[in-house]
Amino acid sequence: MSYNLTDPYEIARFIKESKKSTPVKVYVNGDLSNAEMNDVEWYGSNGFYILMGESDSITKIVLDNKHLIKHFRIENDRRNSAIPMLDLLEVDARIEPGAIIRDKVTIGKNAVIMMGAVINIGAEIGDGTMVDMNAVVGARGQLGKNVHLGAGAVVAGVLEPPSKEPCMIGDNALIGANSVILEGVKIGAGSVVAAGSVVTEDVPDNVVVAGSPAKIIKAVDDKTKDKTQILDDLRK
C-alpha cells in the first residue's frame, strides 16, 4: 500500500496501519542447542548465544529454556515502534553517531547530520545542508541546499496538529542556535535567523530576523555573509 507523505493525514494513516515493533537483542549464557529459533536471528554455540528479534518471540525462547539458561541480558531501545530508523548504508552524506533519523526521510548528497540531531518522517534535507547537534527537524520539514540549522534549533513538524503546509527553509539560509521555526513558516533563500529567535511568520529572501517573535532587522550584507559563511570542508 502506498502513502502520500506530503499529507499529514496520510502519514498518520501510515503510522496507524504499520506493524508495531519491539525489537530486542538478548545475550544468553546457557544451552540453546535444541531450542526452536525459527522466528529470530541468532548467533553462537557452546553455551553462548546472541538472539535478535521481536520481544514476544525471544521471550518465549527464554521461558521455554529457562532451566538450561544460567544468565541472560536483554537490550531494548523502543516499544511498539511504528516507524523504523532510516537505513543509512546508502545515504551519501556524513551522519555522526547518535543522530536519530526515521524512515521515509530524504537526505541530500554531502549533507551533515550531527550528534543528537532528530529528523522525523517525511522530512527532506538538501544537498550540503548541516543539521547541527541536538537540532530537530519535525515531520515533513523541508531544508534546502547548503542550509545551516544551528545546534538546538527546531523546525516544527506538521503532523500533530495536522497542517497542509510544512516548514520550508530556503537554500543557503542560516538558522541560529536554539531558534524555533513554527509550523508552516517559510524562511527565504539566503536569510539569517538570529540565535534564540522564534519565527512565527514567513521570512523573505536575504534578510536577517531576530527576536521573539522574530522581526526583520536588516538586509543581508557583506558583514553578515562573513559571519555566516558555510565551510565546504565540513561537507567533504
From Swiss-Prot:
PROSITE patterns according to UniProt: HEXAPEP_TRANSFERASES
Q: Name one GO molecular function term.
A: tetrahydrodipicolinate N-acetyltransferase activity
UniProt pathway: Amino-acid biosynthesis; L-lysine biosynthesis via DAP pathway; LL-2,6-diaminopimelate from (S)-tetrahydrodipicolinate (acetylase route): step 1/3
Question: According to its UniProt record, which protein family does this protein belong to?
Answer: Belongs to the transferase hexapeptide repeat family. DapH subfamily.
What name does UniProt use for this protein? 2,3,4,5-tetrahydropyridine-2,6-dicarboxylate N-acetyltransferase
* Catalysed reaction equations from the record: (S)-2,3,4,5-tetrahydrodipicolinate + acetyl-CoA + H2O = L-2-acetamido-6-oxoheptanedioate + CoA
Write the record's keywords in alphabetical order, separated by commas. Answer: Acyltransferase, Amino-acid biosynthesis, Diaminopimelate biosynthesis, Lysine biosynthesis, Repeat, Transferase
Report the record's Gene Ontology biological process terms. Answer: diaminopimelate biosynthetic process; lysine biosynthetic process via diaminopimelate
